Regions:
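Conserved AMP-binding/adenylation subdomain of ANL enzymes
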Residues: 8-25, 32-132
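Gly/Ser/Thr-rich phosphate-binding loop
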Residues: 71-74, 86-189, 202, 286
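Residue-level signal for inorganic ion chemistry
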Residues: 73, 150, 203, 250, ...
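Conserved ATP-binding/catalytic segment of the ANL
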Residues: 197-264, 281
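Adenylate-forming
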Residues: 218, 251-280, 307, 325-328, ...
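C-terminal boundary motif of the adenylate-forming
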Residues: 244, 281-307
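Conserved C-terminal "lid"/linker of ANL adenylate-forming enzymes
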Residues: 287-289, 320-376
């Protein structure tokens, strides 16, 4: 149960973090049944006096962006992942264009980090209108701010858009907190993190590594379910989020979901989210999910156009080399058909429904484990 006070406190706090201007136009992409969109894509612009334009459907988003020319977009990472994939696909045929795109992103990223010298800044100013301009024009040509939440943002995606000159801010929240808990600021943006807590929101990490939240936006409780409420909300008002996290220099870094932890047959625990994010940094992988609960090793389910398992294992190994030795992919199940919302394999914010995906491919997973490890 979210009260008017819960929601309005969240709206007021969000507007202290993100600036909306009188000339802005916000495009709404996500379902209004989701609290992220309801607060950030509806109540926040309403409070700021900013008009909201609604896309007809995700499949018509490109046309709507060109027509509406929004300045602000609130979306889940998957929207930008798809957009970037299309850009990279278009560049694949021209090594020169691909090289110029990569150079522009690299220079823009160095500028964002404050590490660009005078020559690099001059070169970026030269390349940006010629390389970044045409790409950002596909987003309508006026987009100045992208607020991303609802699922983890890949660093590769953030780096690409920020490098092109778009301000992309990752935030974090959950429905039980109305929903925004934290967010990066335009003047203090660290895409590795989800930013600092909103004004008035307190956070801490308990002994189990789980993020706890307290503040005026935290729910009253679950409807007619005192037992479920007591399980996540203590007498002091601390809400158990179910997310594993670290707090570094005041910023929150989400490490995964407590319920998603995979316990291997040797008792070692693996948080799949960080590993999956690292894998998605490789353009070869479109969608991924690690499995291995109660098993001796991990198997990767990957939506990809590559069919050679040895190639896929090598790419996975390269992306996971900095992880512990237990986070190693020994087999890959290559899948051509993407996981979709219509099929019931994604949430409304386009996060993978792990149980649903596992159930769909259960027989193939069992078969792979029966056949054992493949030597690369």
């Amino acid at each position: 149960m979210l009260s008017h006070r819960n929601i309005l406190s969240n709206v007021a706090a969000a507007l202290e973090v993100v600036s909306l201007h009188p000339g802005d136009v916000l495009i709404s992409v996500l379902p209004l049944s989701h609290m992220f969109e309801r607060t950030c894509g509806y109540y926040v612009p309403l409070k700021a006096g900013v008009p909201v334009a609604y896309t007809r459907s995700i499949n018509q988003l490109a046309e709507d962006l060109a027509f509406l020319k929004p300045t602000v977009m609130v979306a889940v990472p998957r929207v930008f992942q798809r957009f970037l994939a299309r850009v990279e696909q278009a560049l694949a045929a021209s090594p020169l264009k691909r090289a110029l795109f990569s150079l522009t992103v690299a220079l823009g990223w160095r500028k964002f980090e404050g590490r660009a010298g005078k020559v690099e800044q001059s070169l970026f100013r030269l390349l940006q209108p010629r390389v970044a301009g045409p790409v950002l024009n596909r987003l309508g040509g006026r987009l100045r701010l992208a607020v991303v939440g609802g699922a983890p943002l890949e660093l590769r995606v953030a780096r690409s858009f920020i490098g092109l000159g778009l301000s992309m801010l990752q935030g974090y929240g959950l429905t039980e907190a109305s929903p925004v808990v934290a967010g990066n600021r335009e003047h203090d943006n660290d895409p590795v993190s989800v930013g600092a807590p909103l004004p008035g929101v307190a956070v801490r990490v308990n002994e189990a590594g789980e993020l706890l939240v307290r503040g005026p936006s935290v729910m009253l409780g679950y409807w007619h379910s005192p037992q479920a409420t007591a399980a996540v909300l203590d007498a002091e008002g601390w809400l158990n989020t179910g997310d594993l996290a670290e707090i570094r220099a005041g910023k929150i870094i989400i490490k995964g979901r407590t319920k998603d932890i995979l316990v291997l047959s040797n008792g070692e625990k693996v948080s799949p989210q960080d590993a999956e994010m690292a894998l998605l940094d490789d353009p070869l992988f479109e969608q991924v999910m690690l499995v291995g609960e109660g098993r001796a090793y991990l198997v990767l389910l990957a939506v990809t156009q590559e069919s050679d398992e040895r190639t896929l294992i090598k790419h996975a190994k390269a992306r996971l080399k900095s992880f512990s030795r237990w986070v190693r992919v020994r087999r890959v199940i290559a899948l051509r058909e993407p996981w979709t919302l219509a099929e019931g394999l994604l949430t409304t914010t386009l996060k993978v429904k792990r149980n649903a995906v596992y159930d769909k491919y259960r027989e193939r997973i069992e078969s792979v484990y029966r056949n054992g490890i493949r030597t690369v």
